[in-house]
From Swiss-Prot:
Pfam families per the UniProt record, alphabetical: SIS_2
Similarity comment: family membership: Belongs to the UPF0309 family.
SIS domain segment(s): 31-214
GO molecular function, one term: carbohydrate derivative binding
GO biological process, one term: carbohydrate derivative metabolic process
Protein name: UPF0309 protein LMOf2365_2617
Gene3D superfamilies listed in its UniProt record: Glucose-6-phosphate isomerase like protein, domain 1
PROSITE patterns in the record: SIS
Length: 247
């Protein structure tokens, strides 16, 4: 099974390279432009998609201007099944997005593989209303196979200024066994992480080419990194309180 899973995942990544690279580069350019103008990069996902927002937050080799919107009832640790129920509620996003410090010039990255549930769609639209540029990471194939649960009939892909397709199959899982009817082994976390890291790599290279110093963290386990990292925390802590919370 390991060979099958890795083979399929590699093919998905190759498809992303072949078909989505221009969108990734465009997204990277917008991220660079935002950071060069004191913007913040917000990310949101429900359920397992929220994992990707934490993958790029306070990350060694990653950008400091990253703000994951972590609404705990929509994560997993306060009730996994309950989070799925909430994700399907129209207008629920208004209960937490109203207080988010999203400004014109910021970037909002919204992740949902199915792209059918109301909360990610509403998050994208509220962020746009606040002036953010919206980047969506979703599966166009999966999304097209399912009816939208949003009252407008929209899917997440309808809300993005840039839409990047992670290529996930319907249901996300890619493996099957002859003696088992349910597909297993999802791919969207792997492809999502690659897409995000590629966007930010493009952004960092763009900033370097613009003679702008990218705000990149050094691993805290490398000697003499602490002062560098603390300066970045201090720089962004007002906009991203999660960076310095509880210190």
């Amino acid at each position: 099974m390991i060979n099958n899973y890795i083979d399929i995942t590699v093919r998905l990544l190759e498809n992303i390279l072949d078909n989505e690279a221009d969108y990734v580069k465009e997204a990277g350019a917008k991220v660079a432009e935002s950071i060069e103008n004191d913007g913040v990069i917000h990310l949101f996902g429900c359920g397992h998609s929220h994992i990707l927002t934490e993958e790029v937050f306070y990350r060694a080799g990653g950008l400091a201007a990253i703000h994951p919107i972590l609404h705990e009832p929509l994560m997993l640790h306060e009730g996994a099944a309950a989070s799925s129920v909430l994700e399907r509620k129209n207008d629920y996003a208004k209960t937490f997005m109203a207080e988010e410090d999203i400004r014109p010039g910021d970037i909002m990255i919204v992740l949902s593989t199915s792209g059918r549930n109301p909360v990610p769609i509403d998050v994208a639209e509220i962020a746009r209303e606040k002036g953010a540029f919206v980047i969506v990471i979703t599966s166009l194939q999966y999304s097209a196979s399912q009816k939208s649960r949003h009252t407008s009939g929209k899917r997440l892909s309808d809300t993005g200024d840039i839409v990047i397709d992670n290529g996930a199959v319907k249901g996300d899982a890619v493996l099957k066994s002859a003696n088992f009817d349910i597909a297993f082994a999802p791919t969207s976390t792997v492809t999502g992480a690659v897409i995000l890291q590629s966007i930010f790599a493009e952004a960092i290279e763009t900033m370097v080419n613009d003679n702008f110093t990218p705000p990149v963290f050094i691993s805290g386990n490398v000697e003499n990194a602490d002062a560098h990292n603390q300066a970045l925390v201090d720089k962004y802590n007002e906009r991203i309180p999660l960076l310095g919370m509880n210190l």
